[in-house]
Amino acid sequence: MLHPLLRHLPLALALCAAGAAQAKNLVVCTEASPEGFDIVQYTGAVTADASAETVFNRLLAFRPGTTEVIPGLAERWDVSADGLSYTFHLRPGVKFHTTDYFKPTRSLNADDVLWTFQRALDPKHPWHASALRGYAYFDAMGMGELIKSVEKVDELTVRFVLNRPEAPFLRDMAMPFASIYSAEYGDQLLAAGKQGQLNNQPIGTGPFVFKRYAKDAQVRYTANPDYYAGKPPIDNLVFAITLDPNVRMQKVRAGECQVSLYPKPEDVPRLKQDPNLAVDEIDALLTTYIAINTQHKPLDAPRVRQAINLALDKKAMLDAVFGPGAASPAVGPYPPTLLGYNHSIQDWPHDPERARALLKEAGAENLRITLFIRNGTSPTIPNPALAAQMLQADLAKAGIQLTIRSLEWGELLKRSKAGEHDLSLLGWAGDNGDPDNFLSPNLSCAAAESGENQARWCDKDFEALMRKAREVSDPAERAKLYEQAQVVFHEQAPWIPLAYPKLFNVRRNTVQGYVINPLSNNNFATTSVKP
């Protein structure tokens, strides 16, 4: 078997050849393979980086390093006084990618925005059924019932009419699931009967043009010479897929990649001492948690879920899995930096005897359950195997037998969304800086139906509070509603909230213009590499 470093020798040789022609290359060591490139079907951060952040743009964007909404494909927008109408004015002359499989004949216009959203909204749209995994984010956030219509005002103006006010709507329009597609490319593929190509050969307006993908090896892009914000400083972007964080660190130290994502937290102090490297860190919008499948008996009983929370020695797990100072204990579904975080809620103490008593009360003694974990790492789960083993030992002290199943990330998501798990070790990276972005995709009734809510938990009281908080615009009123919702969440215990991790990335000190993001997405449109 080839050593992992040797496996990428063809990549290194190819880049050396490119370097001979003085092309400017950026190789990023990433932690997993994307699920696909038709971003509307997926919610994973890896997939968003490989598609939304490279190939596509949205009507709005976030200022790099912040959650501030700024113009994207729309250069300006108007909101009606009643909060029900949003009019977006598109930039003129924005070009879609020209590739060997698509040659656009026109610039971006309102038809592309309508095609993008009608595809998800209208079951009769000719492209609706092409999303074989459905419209995960779109459905989980209730966009189908929120958006009344999407109207073409003129070639460069689009109006969204809502059924109710939605406080985070502008933020939503900057999220990966709202990426704008080419209607012309869609028509071309439909006419040729090649709808599946949309997920394999994407076309967008973004800073990089997709070239090719080799699963579990690499994704290659070239800079978009026609990018509306200006051609990126680098000519070629390569995502070198490297599951093992130790190998990622070896490669960035050896210069085989210039950026390496998500080092193990315990390695960060040592990496900071390397004069050739720079470590970027930020208090990110991240939550690590274990979803408890509330549709599996006896996990449908709140007392059983509370018992599982009580059995865990969370502090010991965080110290071992993340290391000192790299994460704080999670109590609720989102970090304390967001609106309405309820500081009055006390975390579950480590109390295995109380856990045993609750299990006995619920008639769930000698409980046997299975935990799904990923076989790689991520910023929310730097060592899934160790976390699972520690949970297994803690649960055993409360009389619970835990079986651990390690799965490839895409397979874990597929099986968890199908409800095959009892417990699933997961993480969520906020996409827009609003509390609703943690709650609706992961804990709403709509998300339970679609499988994105992997606790499969649907609580009418929680749902009502969450929905009302979306509809009101006053931040103080929204905060009170979210505080109440977190009380319901804590009492019902559909998750074991684990951690609010910090985010770390490592780069060669020749890399400039890279901005680490609290939303945990990675965009290299302004990144350059010094010779």
Describe the predicted segments one by one.
Residues K24-T30, A50, A167, A214, ...:
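Detector for C-terminal structural segments
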Residues C29-D82, Q118, H125, Q201-T205:
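N-terminal lobe/hinge region of extracytoplasmic solute-binding protein
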Residues S33-A50, L73-A74, D100-P104, A167-S179, ...:
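A structural "hinge/loop" feature
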Residues E75-W127, R159, K251, P298-D300:
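Aromatic- and charge-enriched surface segment that lines or borders ligand/interaction sites
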Residues H89, D112, L121-G186:
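Surface-exposed binding/hinge segments that line
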Residues G193-N199, N224-R270:
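Ligand-site clamp/hinge motif
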Residues F208, N293, L299, S328-A362, ...:
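Structural transition elements
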Residues T222-P225, A284-A307, A311, A320, ...:
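A bilobed periplasmic-binding-protein/Venus flytrap-type ligand-binding module shared by bacterial periplasmic
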